[in-house]
Amino acid sequence: MRPVFFSLRFFPPCWLCALRDLCAKFFFVATQSRMFEGARPSESVDSAPPRVTLRNFFNHPFDSAIAAARTCYADHLITPEEVTDKQRLNIGAATFNSGHHTVFQHATFEFGLENVSRQFVWSFLHAHPFYNSEQQSQRYVRMDRVQAYVPPVDLYFNESAKEIFEQAISRAWSYYRELSALLINDTRAILADIWRIGPNSNPKHIQKIERSAEKRAIEIARYVLPVAAHTTMVHTISGIVLHRLWRMVAASDAPSETRTVIGAMVAQVKEHDQQFFERFGTEPLEELPEWKAASSIAFAGEAFAREFDAKLGGKTSKLVDYSPNAARVIADSYRAVLGLTESQCSNSDAIDRLLNPAKNLYRLETLNVGVHAPQMRALQHANYTFAKKISHTADSQDQRHRMVPGSRPLLTLADTREPDYITPQLLKENPRAQEVYERAMRDAWSAKNALLDRGVPPEIALYLLPNSKSIRLVETGSLLHLLHKWTMRTCFNAQEEIYAASMDEVGELRRVHPELAKYVGPPCHIRAGITTPICTEGSHFCGIKVWLDFPNVTRRI
């Protein structure tokens, strides 16, 4: 039986709620049965331990490092096969211990990581810029199975505490399924209206909208899932980064899990080349300044949150510092690259040559060649700093813009007893879904607090926090890298919160540097009237001609 769709173009606004209820009447039973498939009243948690696989690697990483070091002072290219035992002993220790670490960066290791928590990934693995990851998406992959990190039982996390922990995780998954079912009618109705779906629409078009509606529903429902939820990824790092990660395993909100995962990565490398670690004796730092400082002060999570939010003034992202002479410095830098005088190229002309996509083909590149283009490097000299507040799940994606680094909180030092979370717009527009969502938030914080009250370490208790947990951070980037980020994240396909933050940031840029901001917008805005295709998303086109009225066009989903 083919689903029936209605076009909202033919209904006055006051009928929308009635139409949503009508949609629910037709679709809820089928949707619920599909989305709740496999659900049980009290599901057990699949808590398989982290699994690390070394997928690709250098055969002789240590000898390659020594050969690279020798090449600096040799009359020919030194190969790993030419390295002697004496050189391994003398050159290896001399370069490593004196801080000449670039030679250990040539060797790279590609790992497969399974059954690791999203808390570990956010708090540690992706908290620095020197890596590459392809991670399983919660936005578009339905989380059917209850899979999450569960710490081993010990003196501070006994069986009764573990029961509270696992029940909270199982309950979160139930809320996830319930919200998925409650929201799909809303997402379907909005998408049907955007794409003008009617009874006579092409069945394949209708099927595509149905798939998209389900993805949009689970994208919002995932906000209730715990940060303990498992994820899977391919993760590639250099040899020196692996050394640094092992040294800093205590520097996160999940030190125990971190030690387990990074320790397994080190062990995998040692199996292929024991010298790469054994020669230097790198060991984890046990006492970090962050924890030492925290031990002498009282926790003030609520007070910190109130103070930070007051400074934001209701914004998602607020400009707190910037290069006041950005336009002139950029223009001077552009002229320096091309050897021009100010009489030959004025400030406004330099800015236009750099940022106008009709005059600078680099702006139309999807390969992001900015750092390789001599003239685009002029944008490196203007910097902007933002204070922002987004959810854990949004920040997990936002932090992937590694050239726009942020100072993110140690949640164990900024914990709040009261629920502190972000609510997506779609939930605010559905009273029933919002009620379920708020109950899920209360339950998550109650379980977390119950563990803390039992003496369970914050490291463990905070795994129960939901994806929606508010993250307050400070982020800085040069205009070069912010330009790339804003181009990608002002697209309607960008994650809702990151889109909102980016729009706030572009608005702030417009306030202080309007001569720069007029060139900023999503790919379609940049490309319209200059090249084709206007939209670079292909079959994932959002359905809205954003380029006709950016930044005034309204995003509905």
Could you describe each region identified by the protein language model?
Residues 1-4, 8-9, 13-23, 32:
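Short, low-complexity, charge-dense intrinsically disordered segments
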Residues 29-557:
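A conserved ligand/cofactor-binding region detector
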